[in-house]
Amino acid sequence: MAGLKCPGIGIENMLNYLKRFLALLVVLFIAAPAAMADDAYPNKPIRIIVPFTPGGSPDILARAVGQKITEATGVSVVVENIPGAGGTIGADRVAKAAPDGYTLLMGHVGTLAVAPSVYPQLPYDPVKSFAAVALVAKVPNILAVNASMPVKNVAELVAYLKANPGKVNYGSGGNGSAAHLAMEYFKMSTQTFIVHVPYRGTAPAVMDTVAGQIQMVFTGAPAVMPMVKSGKLKALGVSSVKRMDTMSDIPTLAESGVKGLNGFEADQWYGLVAPAGTPVAITQKLNQVVNKSLSAQDISTRLRSEGAIPAPTTPENFEQLIQSEIKRWRAVVIKAGIKSE
């Protein structure tokens, strides 16, 4: 009896075609649920972890953006404050969460860019442990002094500091905090010597500057704006490239004409990140919602009134910012010899 033959195609070829077809079915079977899940996102409450105490800039930003996410998607957004260790405890919680888009971190320059250089045993990697979602806002630091200090501008301050090396103190919200590094960067740029006094939080540092226990602070605008407006502190300059809309009478440090401050910028910034491995479709969807919310008049006005500048951008650009800021602040940490408490 003649062997079985298929006209035009051999048995071996048929088996190869069958294997390829089955492989394709497996791929489609695996990919389909993930694709459908991404399309259905979000379908349950989203949690934004703020790694600081309630009431500060990150908390205000998280709640403002969370409200807009709810309006756009119909799902509730829960803001949870998990403070401690300079924000690294809350950040680590998000790094270890499921990468499904339902747990986000309101990241900060401190937790995402400064911490790797200050904390040698950091439990997460700011680049490898997270997926960038959306840069939310930049917050200029305001250089403010006690009202009785005999200086009216940055040039006079630098002259005073050089005439009195080591006799002027400044406060920050803690050793290795963003405000600490900003002032160290200012010191390096102006070649001045100012003594650092670390506090447990920004508020007591600001209040001691008002009381005259220390002479200076260089910290986020929201913390000092009320004291400047009431005349209890003198604002000499802001760390941003442009003047703030809400306090346009305060010049930028770059405008001071002081040698070393040309092009000076040391803003704080805040943005949402998700656990690494979160599907790109989800991070892109969140990015679009956040960017649209930042362009809304009500939220833009609210953020600016708090001293924050809306800063919508792509996840890719936000990722590049994080990486460049890690390098930048590492150089400051090394040169200043800053270590965690």
Question: Where in the sequence are the language-model features?
Answer:
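Short, low-complexity disordered leader/linker segments with a strong preference
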Residues: 1-43, 155, 340-341
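N-terminal (or domain-start) structured segment
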Residues: 37-128, 167-169, 175, 191-220, ...
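An extracytoplasmic/periplasmic, membrane-proximal ligand-sensing/linker region
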Residues: 43-45, 229, 280-341
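Short, surface-exposed alpha-helical segments at coil->helix boundaries
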Residues: 59, 63, 180, 184, ...
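Solvent-exposed, polar/charged alpha-helical surfaces in well-ordered, non-transmembrane soluble domains
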Residues: 63, 67, 71, 92, ...
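Hinge/capping helix and adjacent helix->loop/strand transition within the periplasmic-binding protein
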Residues: 96-102, 109, 117-204, 253, ...
